[in-house]
Regions:
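Redox-cofactor binding/interface segments in oxidoreductases and associated redox assembly factors
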Residues: 88, 154, 176, 201
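Short glycine/serine/threonine-rich phosphate/pyrophosphate-binding segments
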Residues: 1, 8-13, 90-100, 178-186
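Phosphate-handling active-site elements
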Residues: 1-3, 105-113, 189-198
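Phosphate-binding loop/pocket of nucleotide- and phosphate-handling active sites
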Residues: 138, 187-231
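Short, well-ordered alpha-helices that flank and scaffold nucleotide-derived cofactor binding pockets
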Residues: 78, 101, 105, 184-191
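Small/polar-residue-rich loop-to-helix segments that shape phosphate-bearing ligand pockets
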Residues: 3-85, 117-168
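A short, acidic, amphipathic alpha-helical segment used as a generic capping/interface helix at domain edges
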Residues: 160-162, 167, 183-192
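Short glycine/threonine-rich catalytic loop with a Thr-x-Gly-x-Asp
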Residues: 56, 173-179
Length: 231
């Protein structure tokens, strides 16, 4: 059983149904103007039903950050050495928390740059409506830990759209929404990064699942207006 929301693109939903999944699409916004609270409430209802499904709960499960602490970060260091800057998007915050914990444990001087979408509440910002699935949350993930010395940055979704479409047309590479957000953050900060720095950017998704959204002219015009095409 998959519980998703109106921000999910139709291709992903069709893909899941083709694989035999039962997909529920919630349509009510939560108190913060997103869908996560509504989705979580529905999942809890399903889990509590007699014979209900098992829920691994990526928002609270400590195995989520643990695997990134033990494997993702180790793979980065083994291949590239200790980065000076490491850009990570904040969704469930599993990748972000796992890497931050590993950096602290290693005693590395790596600056972890945590990237979120404007309108997300994870870093304590004001909630607002968001349209691109991936990064951001309308409910603060329980696994997010304030103790880590993160450099936190917000990216407006219109800049995510511009970045994704620019890269697709200039570089011939189709980034997903989360990847575009993190790349937009790097673009905004690149002039502040000392020359010769070793920078690692975690790109978690590709753009095929965003063809009906970020890469669809009608969708972009409806949600962001004509200025989104200025890239």
């Amino acid at each position: 059983t998959i519980v998703t929301d109106l921000n999910a693109n139709s291709r992903s939903i069709s893909h899941m149904r083709a694989l035999g999944a039962e997909v529920e699409v919630v349509q009510s916004l939560d108190a913060a103007g997103g869908f996560l609270g509504t989705r979580l409430a529905r999942v809890r209802e399903l889990v509590e039903m007699p014979g209900g499904p098992l829920w691994t709960n990526q928002y609270e499960n400590v195995a989520n950050p643990e695997v990134h602490s033990k494997k993702t970060y180790r793979a980065i260091v083994e291949e590239l050495g200790d980065p000076d800057y490491l850009f990570v998007g904040a969704g469930t915050t599993g990748t972000l928390m796992g890497i931050s914990r590993a950096v602290m444990k290693r005693g590395s001087c790596t600056k972890v740059c945590a990237i979120d979408s404007t309108g997300s509440v994870t870093f304590g910002g004001a909630p607002s409506r968001r349209y691109i699935p991936g990064l951001g949350a309308s409910v603060k993930p329980p696994i997010f830990d304030e103790k880590f010395p993160l450099k936190r940055y917000y990216i407006d979704e219109i800049d995510t759209v511009r970045q994704c479409r620019r890269i697709a047309q200039v570089e011939g590479f189709l980034p997903g929404g989360s990847t575009g957000t993190v790349l937009a953050a790097f673009d905004a900060l690149r002039d502040k990064i000392p020359e010769g720095s070793r920078v690692v950017i975690i790109a978690p998704d590709l753009g095929e699942r965003y063809l009906d959204g970020v890469y669809n002219d009608d969708w972009v015009m409806e949600n962001f207006g004509e200025s989104a095409f200025n890239y």
